[in-house]
Amino acid sequence: EITSEEPNQSLSEHAYLNPPVKAVTCVDMFNQDWKMTGYILGSFDEAFVKQGRLKLDEGHLPENDDEIAMDWNTLLSLGYVGEIGETITIRYCEENSVYNASARQERQFRLCGIFANYTSIWKYGRKMPGAVVTENALSVFNTKSRNSYLYSLKESVRTSDYNTVYKKIKEDAKTETEYNSAVYDYQPWSSALVYAYMYIVVMILAIAAIIYQL
């Protein structure tokens, strides 16, 4: 199904939230035995990296269509060493047909960047792409995709009970959302540190199903 790629209007205009940044989640990755790994290939830009406070330990975001960047958790879980320039093989099924052996495909990329781990640290982190390529490279995968929008709270919104804030936002949005309680409800942080990481206080996935065609 092809639907709007725009973020949810009620969230984009919400009094508590800053404008969103987007990650495209596209390809379910398989291991060498064609078992699902639970990790996703997608694409995001510098704006997402900045708002998500993602840290590149080595290298850079993909600039060319044969490049890929991954976080350490995804990289090591798939059995790679983690060296810049390493060849990464992405195994996937066209149109997400996981039970159709004839749909199995492989594409190779060169590792250009390694992020500090986030897929196993963020709650629901594995719903975000643990491996990213350029949008153009992503467009050749014949798979269903969705847009994930990451929102941050405005600096004026300060409270010790972010769960209540989230519930109010969820009521207003009426869309699929996720609450990262592993971060939001962690009380021992000083207030200054909480505000420094305000980017992750409200992480909302606004789903827009789209299909990339070859």
Where do the model's predicted regions map?
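Hydrophobic alpha-helical transmembrane segments of multi-pass inner-membrane transport and secretion
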Residues: 189-214
